Amino acid sequence: TGSCCGPTFSSLSCGGGCLQPRYYRDPCCCRPVSCQTTVSRPVTFVSRCTRPICEPCRRPVCCDPCSLQEGCCRPITCCPTSCQAVVCRPCCWATTCCQPVSVQCPCCRPTSCQPAPCSRTTCRTFRTSPCC
Protein backbone atom coordinates (compact mmCIF):
# COMPACT_ATOMS: atom_id res chain seq x y z
CA THR A 1 0.00 0.00 0.00
CA GLY A 2 2.43 2.69 1.18
CA SER A 3 6.07 3.15 0.39
CA CYS A 4 8.61 1.11 2.34
CA CYS A 5 11.42 3.36 1.27
CA GLY A 6 11.02 6.34 3.56
CA PRO A 7 13.56 7.34 6.22
CA THR A 8 11.76 5.34 8.93
CA PHE A 9 11.66 2.09 7.00
CA SER A 10 14.20 -0.53 6.08
CA SER A 11 14.29 -3.33 3.56
CA LEU A 12 14.00 -5.81 6.44
CA SER A 13 10.79 -4.21 7.65
CA CYS A 14 9.39 -4.82 4.19
CA GLY A 15 10.31 -8.49 4.22
CA GLY A 16 13.34 -7.93 2.02
CA GLY A 17 11.51 -5.89 -0.59
CA CYS A 18 8.59 -3.53 -1.16
CA LEU A 19 6.14 -2.21 -3.68
CA GLN A 20 5.72 1.52 -4.10
CA PRO A 21 2.60 3.32 -5.37
CA ARG A 22 2.63 4.11 -9.08
CA TYR A 23 2.46 7.84 -8.41
CA TYR A 24 5.55 7.79 -6.21
CA ARG A 25 8.85 6.12 -6.96
CA ASP A 26 11.80 6.93 -4.73
CA PRO A 27 14.88 7.03 -7.02
CA CYS A 28 17.05 5.82 -4.14
CA CYS A 29 14.97 2.68 -3.85
CA CYS A 30 14.53 1.90 -7.51
CA ARG A 31 17.83 0.17 -8.22
CA PRO A 32 20.04 -2.56 -6.84
CA VAL A 33 22.80 -1.56 -4.46
CA SER A 34 25.40 -2.07 -7.20
CA CYS A 35 23.91 0.83 -9.14
CA GLN A 36 23.51 3.41 -6.40
CA THR A 37 24.53 6.92 -7.38
CA THR A 38 28.01 7.75 -6.17
CA VAL A 39 28.48 11.10 -7.91
CA SER A 40 26.48 14.32 -7.70
CA ARG A 41 23.16 14.38 -9.46
CA PRO A 42 21.90 17.58 -11.11
CA VAL A 43 19.71 19.99 -9.17
CA THR A 44 19.92 18.25 -5.80
CA PHE A 45 23.64 17.43 -5.81
CA VAL A 46 23.08 14.54 -3.41
CA SER A 47 26.43 12.80 -3.35
CA ARG A 48 25.34 9.38 -2.16
CA CYS A 49 22.16 7.38 -1.82
CA THR A 50 21.66 6.50 1.84
CA ARG A 51 18.12 5.15 1.98
CA PRO A 52 17.50 1.38 1.98
CA ILE A 53 17.47 -0.44 -1.32
CA CYS A 54 14.09 -2.10 -1.10
CA GLU A 55 12.71 -2.19 -4.63
CA PRO A 56 14.63 -3.53 -7.62
CA CYS A 57 13.91 -2.14 -11.07
CA ARG A 58 11.42 -4.11 -13.09
CA ARG A 59 13.65 -3.93 -16.15
CA PRO A 60 17.39 -4.67 -16.22
CA VAL A 61 19.53 -1.76 -15.05
CA CYS A 62 22.33 -0.46 -17.24
CA CYS A 63 25.20 0.38 -14.94
CA ASP A 64 27.77 2.87 -16.16
CA PRO A 65 30.68 0.96 -17.70
CA CYS A 66 33.08 3.68 -16.57
CA SER A 67 32.08 3.06 -12.95
CA LEU A 68 30.97 6.69 -12.63
CA GLN A 69 27.47 5.54 -11.67
CA GLU A 70 25.87 8.49 -13.41
CA GLY A 71 22.24 9.03 -12.51
CA CYS A 72 20.98 8.63 -16.06
CA CYS A 73 22.62 5.38 -17.01
CA ARG A 74 19.52 3.28 -16.49
CA PRO A 75 16.09 2.82 -18.07
CA ILE A 76 13.65 5.73 -17.96
CA THR A 77 11.52 3.90 -15.37
CA CYS A 78 14.46 3.95 -12.96
CA CYS A 79 15.75 7.44 -13.61
CA PRO A 80 15.81 10.05 -10.85
CA THR A 81 13.24 12.76 -11.54
CA SER A 82 16.01 15.33 -12.03
CA CYS A 83 17.48 13.36 -14.93
CA GLN A 84 16.94 14.62 -18.45
CA ALA A 85 18.96 12.04 -20.35
CA VAL A 86 17.05 8.77 -20.29
CA VAL A 87 19.16 6.39 -22.32
CA CYS A 88 22.00 4.17 -21.22
CA ARG A 89 25.22 5.80 -22.39
CA PRO A 90 28.11 3.60 -23.51
CA CYS A 91 31.58 4.32 -22.21
CA CYS A 92 32.73 5.87 -25.45
CA TRP A 93 34.57 8.72 -23.74
CA ALA A 94 36.92 6.48 -21.75
CA THR A 95 40.03 7.57 -23.63
CA THR A 96 39.35 11.31 -23.57
CA CYS A 97 41.06 13.86 -21.39
CA CYS A 98 38.79 14.31 -18.38
CA GLN A 99 35.81 12.95 -16.47
CA PRO A 100 32.28 14.36 -16.65
CA VAL A 101 31.71 17.20 -14.18
CA SER A 102 28.18 16.01 -13.40
CA VAL A 103 25.45 13.85 -14.86
CA GLN A 104 24.36 16.48 -17.36
CA CYS A 105 27.88 17.74 -18.07
CA PRO A 106 29.81 15.03 -19.90
CA CYS A 107 32.11 17.57 -21.54
CA CYS A 108 34.83 15.27 -22.79
CA ARG A 109 33.17 12.80 -25.08
CA PRO A 110 32.42 12.74 -28.80
CA THR A 111 29.26 14.46 -30.03
CA SER A 112 27.71 11.09 -30.81
CA CYS A 113 27.88 10.18 -27.12
CA GLN A 114 26.48 13.38 -25.66
CA PRO A 115 22.94 13.55 -24.29
CA ALA A 116 20.66 16.14 -25.87
CA PRO A 117 21.23 18.94 -23.29
CA CYS A 118 24.97 18.99 -24.00
CA SER A 119 26.66 20.73 -26.89
CA ARG A 120 30.26 21.15 -25.75
CA THR A 121 32.72 18.61 -27.15
CA THR A 122 35.97 19.82 -25.62
CA CYS A 123 37.24 20.03 -22.06
CA ARG A 124 37.45 23.27 -20.17
CA THR A 125 40.65 24.05 -18.34
CA PHE A 126 39.22 24.30 -14.84
CA ARG A 127 37.65 21.18 -13.35
CA THR A 128 35.34 23.25 -11.13
CA SER A 129 33.67 24.93 -14.08
CA PRO A 130 30.56 23.38 -15.67
CA CYS A 131 31.05 22.15 -19.20
CA CYS A 132 27.61 22.07 -20.74
Swiss-Prot record:
Keywords: Keratin. One of its GO terms (cellular component) is cytosol. The keratin products of mammalian epidermal derivatives such as wool and hair consist of microfibrils embedded in a rigid matrix of other proteins. The matrix proteins include the high-sulfur and high-tyrosine keratins, having molecular weights of 6-20 kDa, whereas the microfibrils contain the larger, low-sulfur keratins (40-56 kDa). This is Keratin, high-sulfur matrix protein, IIIA3. It comes from Capra hircus (Goat). The lineage of its organism: Eukaryota, Metazoa, Chordata, Craniata, Vertebrata.
